């Protein structure tokens, strides 16, 4: 990991989907840069043993009341909010226990990945604006910007449009908030070693196939995505808004 330098000192950051994968990597990276970090997930994330000033809340990002309660608590306890990372997400493989109900899987993936990003952003904006502005970073995917064969009847077809929606929502929100001191960008990772891809990479043949999609010959790591999130959260990206930063080992360059 890059040596910390206090790039987020004095900032309050909320990260959803913080229990594992990219979200967890973000809370670790932001905390190392001296941010006050609020870790949020459907079940209260465990932050014991992590360095820095961290707190955690259970929150359902598909429920407005749940989100508003967390943001009100953040405002009361920390006096503001500057950075939001919308990392909460599901795939068809973990959206529902019943993997045969394709229609419900579609609804659930869209609800968490797209509606959750919308609701969390919507309820965060007033607090970020009151705090003097800041940044929203949304987690999209390369699947949101290129076509990828998923199979119409297996439920996986919901994931790309959910992430494509995040890309377009990011652009729309960025334009809406540009004159209010809030920058909005999204990250589009390729395949990354997280719980969302664990069931795929456990099979050697599939794992090698996925690695082969990337010219660099490997999958991404959560900390590599967190480093990009840090850049977009920091003042180093002060003239960047409405952008989709692709982090994919060359996958979309082919």
Regions found by a protein language model. Name each.
Residues 2-5, 146, 154, 230, ...:
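Short C-terminal tail/terminal secondary-structure segment
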Residues 121-122, 171:
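A short, exposed helix-loop element centered on a Lys and neighboring polar residues
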Residues 167, 186, 208-236, 240, ...:
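C-terminal helical subdomain
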């Amino acid at each position: 990991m890059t040596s910390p330098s206090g790039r987020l000192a004095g900032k309050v950051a909320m990260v959803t989907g913080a229990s594992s994968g990219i979200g967890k990597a973000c809370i670790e990276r932001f905390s190392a840069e001296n941010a006050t970090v609020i870790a949020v997930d459907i079940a209260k994330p465990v932050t014991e043993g992590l360095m820095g000033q961290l707190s955690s809340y259970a929150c359902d990002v598909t429920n407005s009341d749940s989100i508003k309660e967390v943001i009100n608590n953040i405002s009361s306890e920390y006096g503001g909010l500057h950075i939001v990372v919308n990392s909460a997400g599901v795939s068809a493989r973990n959206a529902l226990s019943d993997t045969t109900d394709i229609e419900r899987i579609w609804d659930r993936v869209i609800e968490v990945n797209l509606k959750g990003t919308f609701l969390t952003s919507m309820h965060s904006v007033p607090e970020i604006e009151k705090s003097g502005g800041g940044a929203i970073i949304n987690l999209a995917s390369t699947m949101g910007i290129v076509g990828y064969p998923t199979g119409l009847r297996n439920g996986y077809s919901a994931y790309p449009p959910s992430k494509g929606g995040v890309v377009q929502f990011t652009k729309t929100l960025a334009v809406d908030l540009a004159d209010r001191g809030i920058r909005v960008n999204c990250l589009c990772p390729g395949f990354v070693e997280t719980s969302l891809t664990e069931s795929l990479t456990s099979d050697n043949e599939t794992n090698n196939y996925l690695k082969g999609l990337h010219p660099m010959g490997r999958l991404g790591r959560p900390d590599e995505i967190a480093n990009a999130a840090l850049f977009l959260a920091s003042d180093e990206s002060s003239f960047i808004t409405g952008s989709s930063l692709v982090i994919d080992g060359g996958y979309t360059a082919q």
